[in-house]
Amino acid sequence: RKLNVDLIVRHNGGHQAAHNVVTPEGVRHCFSSFGSGMLIPGTKTFLSSKMLISPDSFLNEGEILKSKGVTDVFERTFISDNCPIVTPWHTMVGQMLELERDEARHGSCRMGVGQAVYDSDAGRALLVKDLFGYEKLVKRLTEIFEAKKRVAAGILKRSLGSTNAAKLQATFNYFTTERNVSAVFDRYRKFSALVGFRTVLDQQFLAGDYKTIIFEGAQGALLDREYGFAPYITKSKTTYHNAKALLDQSRAGVQIH
């Protein structure tokens, strides 16, 4: 409020962020998929290509914010065409891997962000722009679903007789039935219909006329995949690198604090 910020840019991580805000009026919200200034009227959020998006979490949190009086939360949110998507099956694999580790677990948030980063780094990411061609989307979702089922089946096989075998099977059953391709497709159609005309390219959107931009990360520096302490790290860069890369693309000569 004091800086008259008009744009908040998310530049790393995904919906595992948990940024608690309390307004002077007593409104409370824990932000995960939106910029933490959205309780301030007029402030915009930009989800850059450096952030990963869970359409489910985005839609759910948006409805919660609307119930708290932020009725235009979706209208004030803009998304990069090239944001990678965190699917429920990334979440399935992430949860099952952490269960398999048992006492050697890493402390994962188990939301699938790390698994989606792996796919993005390997050039296999499902991107926001891929959600708008429905026939192609069904094909891509089916490919991801089958690939993650194979990974999950391997975890189940390795874990037969283990203390977490029943939990692993229950996790697999839920994500392959309740979160099947048809259910996820319907949810993603709702997401794409809602945000379609507000999807943009990083450099075009960030080159706009803004007074003050805040770049909001998702984790602390000691979780950075290069500078943190393995294995207790996230899979993405948590320092200023992504923010600087975005600025270098679009706002040469900008004053940085």
Predicted segments, located by residue:
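Non-transmembrane, aqueous-exposed alpha-helical and coiled segments at domain scale
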Residues: R1-H257
